Curated annotation (Swiss-Prot):
Residues 159-186 have a biased composition (Acidic residues). This is Nucleophosmin. It is found in: Nucleus, Nucleolus; Nucleus, Nucleoplasm; Cytoplasm, Cytoskeleton, Microtubule organizing center, Centrosome. Belongs to the nucleoplasmin family. There is a cross-link at K27, K32, K141, K150, K214, K246, K248, K255, K261, K265, K271 (Glycyl lysine isopeptide (Lys-Gly) (interchain with G-Cter in SUMO2)). The modification N-acetylmethionine is found at M1. The modification Phosphotyrosine is found at Y67. The gene is Npm1. The modification ADP-ribosylserine is found at S206. The modification Phosphoserine is found at S4, S10, S43, S70, S125, S139, S225, S240, S241, S252, S258. It comes from Mus musculus. Involved in diverse cellular processes such as ribosome biogenesis, centrosome duplication, protein chaperoning, histone assembly, cell proliferation, and regulation of tumor suppressors p53/TP53 and ARF. Binds ribosome presumably to drive ribosome nuclear export. Associated with nucleolar ribonucleoprotein structures and bind single-stranded nucleic acids. Acts as a chaperonin for the core histones H3, H2B and H4. Stimulates APEX1 endonuclease activity on apurinic/apyrimidinic (AP) double-stranded DNA but inhibits APEX1 endonuclease activity on AP single-stranded RNA. InterPro entries: NPM1_C, Nucleoplasmin, Nucleoplasmin_core_dom, Nucleoplasmin_core_dom_sf.
Length: 292
C-alpha cells in the first residue's frame, strides 16, 4: 500500500550499510535510529555461533513492533554447534526499533545483515542530468561529418573577395588624385557604385560556386534555444496539500488498502510518503484518520 503511494511522489534511492552484532547470555543488542524523515529497515542475513560457543541449545529472539504498534517477540533461529551452527535468514527485514537477545544459551552468537535507508532523490540533480544529456545531444548534431567545415570556407573566400575589392578601390582613389579636379569629381561616382555593387558581386560569386550563407543560421538558433533552457530551470515539486493527501488516502482505502492505526506510525507514514512537515496539517490528517 505504501509503494502505491510512493508512485506519485519523488523516487526513493536506497542506501545499504553493513550491519553486525554479537549476542551473549547477558548482552542484548538494541537497534534504534534518529527520528528523521528517511525510512529505515534492518535486513538480517545470517545467525551463527561464534568461536568458543558450547555444544548446547542457543535460541535467538527478536523484539519489535507489529502492525498495530504493539511489541511482539519472534524466535529467529535455534542453533547447536554439533547439529546446526549457522542459519541463513535470507533477508529478514524488520522496522526499527529492534531488540536482539539470546533467550537460551551462553553464546557468543553473531548476527549479520544490512541497514537499509531510503533517501529521496534530489530534484535539482535530476534537472542537471537532463540538461547535460541535452547538451551532449546538441553537440553531437553540430559535429556531424562534412557539415561543420563548409561555413568557415565560405567565410574565408568572402573575406578574400572583400580584400580584393578594397585594393581595387584604393588603386582607383590613387588614380583620381593624379587627375584634375573635374575628372576627380567624375571618377568618384563610379567608385561609389563599385563599392555598392560589391555585395551583389559577392552574392553572384557565391551563387556561381553553389554555396550559400543560410546554413549558418540554424546553428545560432540552436545556441539561443539552449541559452533559454539554461535560464529557465525547473522548480522542484513541493509537498502535497492536506486535501490532496486525504484524496489519495481515501482512494487507497477504496482499492482495499489500509492506513496505520497508531499515531506514531501514521505520522511517520505521512512524512515519508507525502513529505509533509507541517505539524498542524499532520494532526488534521490524524483526526481525519480516526474518524474513518
Amino acid at each position: 500500500m505504501e509503494d502505491s503511494m510512493d508512485m506519485d511522489m519523488s523516487p526513493l534511492r536506497p542506501q545499504n550499510y553493513l550491519f553486525g552484532c554479537e549476542l551473549k547470555a547477558d548482552k542484548d543488542y538494541h537497534f534504534k535510529v534518529d527520528n528523521d524523515e528517511n525510512e529505515h529497515q534492518l535486513s538480517l542475513r545470517t545467525v551463527s555461533l561464534g568461536a568458543g560457543a558450547k555444544d548446547e541449545l542457543h535460541i535467538v529472539e527478536a523484539e519489535a513492533m507489529n502492525y498495530e504498534g504493539s511489541p511482539i517477540k519472534v524466535t529467529l533461529a535455534t542453533l547447536k554447534m554439533s547439529v546446526q551452527p549457522t542459519v541463513s535468514l535470507g533477508g529478514f527485514e524488520i522496522t526499527p526499533p529492534v531488540v536482539l537477545r539470546l533467550k537460551c544459551g551462553s553464546g557468543p552468537v553473531h548476527i549479520s545483515g544490512q541497514h537499509l535507508v531510503a533517501v529521496e532523490e534530489d530534484a535539482e540533480s535530476e534537472d542537471e542530468d537532463e540538461e547535460d544529456v541535452k547538451l551532449l545531444g546538441m553537440s553531437g548534431k553540430r559535429s556531424a561529418p562534412g557539415g561543420g567545415n563548409k561555413v568557415p570556407q565560405k567565410k574565408v573566400k568572402l573575406d578574400e573577395d572583400d580584400e580584393d575589392d578594397d585594393e581595387d578601390d584604393e588603386d582607383d582613389e590613387d588614380d583620381d588624385d593624379d587627375d584634375f579636379d573635374e575628372e576627380e569629381t567624375e571618377e568618384k561616382v563610379p567608385v561609389k557604385k563599385s563599392v555598392r555593387d560589391t555585395p551583389a558581386k559577392n552574392a553572384q560569386k557565391s551563387n556561381q560556386n553553389g554555396k550559400d550563407l543560410k546554413p549558418s543560421t540554424p546553428r545560432s538558433k540552436g545556441q539561443e534555444s539552449f541559452k533559454k533552457q539554461e535560464k529557465t530551470p525547473k522548480t522542484p515539486k513541493g509537498p502535497s496539500s492536506v486535501e490532496d493527501i486525504k484524496a489519495k488516502m481515501q482512494a487507497s482505502i477504496e482499492k482495499g488498502g489500509s492506513l496505520p492505526k497508531v499515531e506514531a506510525k501514521f505520522i511517520n507514514y505521512v512524512k515519508n510518503c507525502f513529505r509533509m512537515t507541517d505539524q498542524e496539517a499532520i494532526q488534521d490528517l490524524w483526526q481525519w484518520r480516526k474518524s474513518l
